[in-house]
């Protein structure tokens, strides 16, 4: 039990969980402002990581990223979203690792820890192309050792997914502020008209 509690406390320290009482650990609800801050940091850090990775990547690491992309596509095809999510996260973190910048990798890990539950909640609603479409462009840029193209592709990946994530976070924030499901559905319907 001690090891589990230590692991849970580490997740609290990483801001992936919130400790409400000694026995009550919860996934934090991100505010819109907090989500936008994390997304802005991911854009900068993962963009820099992709740029640097394109300059430094070796054939073995590139092959690993290609395998992760294929595994992600396979998981999506068999509707295994848990596996697809793991592959998606591993791809992003592997790209950060390929940059050869350990501090950057730690920051990216920390940001992913904070947003993993949110990404999991929204991933099911993404189209297959949205889930991995930009990953193909990243691989192409890495093969060509094209740092600016790699940066652009990872930024587009984060932004495209971020649109749906932002809508989800806004909805969650309104729910916690007391809006009813019916009110939110009506607002969403009016916005679509």
Segments and roles (model prediction):
Residues 1-55, 163-193:
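Short linear motifs at protein or domain termini
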Residues 3-4, 14, 60-62, 126:
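Intrinsically disordered, low-complexity segments enriched in polar/charged residues with Gly/Pro
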Residues 22, 45, 67, 130-133:
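Alpha-helix N-cap/N′ positions at the starts of helices
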Residues 33-34, 38, 59-120, 133-140, ...:
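Conserved amphipathic alpha-helical segments that form helical-bundle/coiled-coil interaction surfaces
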Residues 42-43, 51, 61-62, 86, ...:
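Short, intrinsically disordered/low-complexity patches at protein termini
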Residues 54-55, 100, 123-125:
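Short helix-capping/hinge motifs at transmembrane helix termini and TM-loop junctions
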Residues 124-193:
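C-terminal regulatory/effector modules of DNA-binding transcriptional regulators
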């Amino acid at each position: 039990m001690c090891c589990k509690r230590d692991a849970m406390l580490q997740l609290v320290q990483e801001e992936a969980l919130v400790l409400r009482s000694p026995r009550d650990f919860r996934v934090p609800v991100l505010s819109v402002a907090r989500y936008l801050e994390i997304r802005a940091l991911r854009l900068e850090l993962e963009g820099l990581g992709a740029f640097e990775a394109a300059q430094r990547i070796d054939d073995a690491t590139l092959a690993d990223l290609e395998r992760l992309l294929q595994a992600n596509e396979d998981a999506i095809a068999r509707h295994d979203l848990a596996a697809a999510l793991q592959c998606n996260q591993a791809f992003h973190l592997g790209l950060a690792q390929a940059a050869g910048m350990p501090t950057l990798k730690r920051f990216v890990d920390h940001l992913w820890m904070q947003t993993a539950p949110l990404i999991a909640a929204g991933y099911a609603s993404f189209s297959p192309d949205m889930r991995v479409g930009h990953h193909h462009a990243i691989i192409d840029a890495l093969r060509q050792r094209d740092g600016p193209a790699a940066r652009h592709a990872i930024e587009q990946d984060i932004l495209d997914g971020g649109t749906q994530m932002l809508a989800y976070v806004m909805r969650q924030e309104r729910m916690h502020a007391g809006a009813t499901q019916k009110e939110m559905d009506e607002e969403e319907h009016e916005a679509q008209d």
